[in-house]
Amino acid sequence: MNINCSPLGFLISLFFIVTFLAPQVKSRAFFVFGDSLVDNGNNDYLVTTARADNYPYGIDYPTRRPTGRFSNGLNIPDIISEAIGMPSTLPYLSPHLTGENLLVGANFASAGIGILNDTGIQFVNIIRISKQMEYFEQYQLRVSALIGPEATQQLVNQALVLITLGGNDFVNNYYLIPFSARSRQYALPDYVVYLISEYGKILRKLYELGARRVLVTGTGAMGCAPAELAQHSRNGECYGALQTAAALFNPQLVDLIASVNAEIGQDVFVAANAYQMNMDYLSNPEQFGFVTSKVACCGQGPYNGIGLCTPVSNLCPNRDLYAFWDAFHPTEKANRIIVNQILTGSSKYMHPMNLSTAMLLDSSKI
């Protein structure tokens, strides 16, 4: 068994991170952009249906209360913060994001958004990626008033940035309804090329705004989500159209990142192969301690994949035995498997290096 896939391997990796990586990396701010996979609660402050503010969301969070995270507990940004010895970043819209809390960083992510501005229009009031960038500029002005412009520029340049986009551009746009506007406008391969082109503009904007170490996650195994199984699967097989979309999108994202890094002249952007990370435990759930990788812990209908996770939904008693928390989102345990690969994974998962290597390189420059 591959040690990185086993419980022992996970513990060894965690020991390495806590005892070796965290002490060597100077405290740095952490900024998060993207969708529901990384939203720490911004949508709780918006009038939108894309919210996770009801029980049983947060059932395993330290406070045992919903926080706006689409998880039973911690999400990917929380676990990255934990691994590098920093507190979780607050949502940018939180009234508590003031004073010294600003220096930790901020989470700008908003459930439902995508690369394109017409993605997630059914959710109406969400923070589209262009607005997230505006908030990042606003954040820098707020911090400049606190510590001065030079120190602010240094804080941003030395920060870690995470961006997670793309899934909703397929699930909540191209494949949202039969004969959607985008599917009539583009054949799938052409749509992917368009998405990658638009994503390139976003990454270059991040660099322009001062980001110098950016982790970019590709789309996960979208067709294997319980919501997709409930709609499209007869025997538990993943929905082929979305799997094909991911197979087209992710390699082109890696190529884009290599191209942008070449333009800049340094490896600012690091690609995470979220699809492969997902497929490892979805294809072999028992190897990771899951009893199922198809049925969501919280939900209703086939695979618990219909509708929202609510107080009256089916709820599994042990979330650690399930890969999916709700119809679309991983459990905290699955998120920990993903972050473990982000931090210590081989070139199969991370390009051009894993996050631990990147951060150790960064620490030598600070």
Swiss-Prot record:
Disulfide bonds: none annotated. Mostly expressed in flowers, reproductive stems and rosette leaves, and, to a lower extent, in roots. Induction: By high salinity (LiCl and NaCl). Also induced transiently by salicylic acid (SA). The active site is at S36, D326, H329. It is found in: Secreted. Glycans are attached at N117, N354. InterPro entries: GDSL, GDSL_Est/Lipase, SGNH_hydro_sf, SGNH_plant_lipase-like. Coiled coil: none annotated. Keywords: Glycoprotein, Hydrolase, Lipid degradation, Lipid metabolism, Secreted, Signal. SUPFAM superfamilies: SGNH hydrolase. Transmembrane segments: none annotated. GO terms for biological process: hyperosmotic salinity response; lipid catabolic process; response to lithium ion; response to salicylic acid. GO terms for molecular function: hydrolase activity, acting on ester bonds. Its EC number is 3.1.1.-. The keyword Membrane does not apply. The keyword Ion transport does not apply. It comes from the Eukaryota. Its main location: secreted. Residues 1-27 form the signal peptide. One of its GO terms (cellular component) is extracellular region. Binds to VLG at the endomembrane system. Involved in the mechanisms of salt tolerance. Mediates resistance to LiCl and NaCl. Belongs to the 'GDSL' lipolytic enzyme family. This is GDSL esterase/lipase LTL1. It comes from Arabidopsis thaliana.
